[in-house]
């Protein structure tokens, strides 16, 4: 078995895809910056270390998620992320 590596936003976001016991996922890191992500599947995003400030689709306010916290994003939408410190995350896809 091999792992697929992904790189986005000029190398500022990197991830490694894997198959968990229940769902496909990625484990990744984000550098300081602001990003807009598009989803293809329903996502469960957990901050492993650091923090992500997120504006979910339809929301008017930004919300910060710290290490150990999870947010969910519907499939086929875009969401915005602000990263103030290098952050590690786990994303599972449903």
UniProtKB/Swiss-Prot annotation:
EC assignment:
2.4.2.1, 2.4.2.2
User: Cellular component terms, GO, for this chain's entry?
Assistant: cytosol
Q: For this protein, what is any one GO molecular function term? A: guanosine phosphorylase activity
Give the keywords, sorted.
Answer: Glycosyltransferase, Transferase
Please verify whether the record's keywords include Glycosyltransferase: yes
**Role description:** Catalyzes the phosphorolysis of diverse nucleosides, yielding D-ribose 1-phosphate and the respective free bases. Can use uridine, adenosine, guanosine, cytidine, thymidine, inosine and xanthosine as substrates. Also catalyzes the reverse reactions.
The protein in question is named: Pyrimidine/purine nucleoside phosphorylase
Native organism is Psychromonas ingrahamii (strain DSM 17664 / CCUG 51855 / 37)
Its organism's taxonomic lineage begins at: Bacteria, Pseudomonadati, Pseudomonadota, Gammaproteobacteria, Alteromonadales
Q: Which gene encodes it?
A: ppnP
């Amino acid at each position: 078995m091999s792992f697929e590596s992904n790189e986005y936003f000029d190398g500022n976001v990197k991830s490694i895809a894997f198959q968990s016991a229940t769902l496909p996922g990625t484990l990744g890191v984000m550098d300081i910056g602001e990003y807009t992500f598009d989803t293809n599947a329903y996502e469960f995003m957990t901050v492993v270390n650091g923090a992500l400030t997120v504006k979910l689709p339809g929301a008017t306010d930004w919300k910060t998620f710290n290490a150990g916290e999870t947010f969910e994003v519907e499939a086929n939408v875009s969401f915005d992320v602000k990263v103030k410190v290098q952050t590690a995350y786990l994303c599972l896809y449903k």
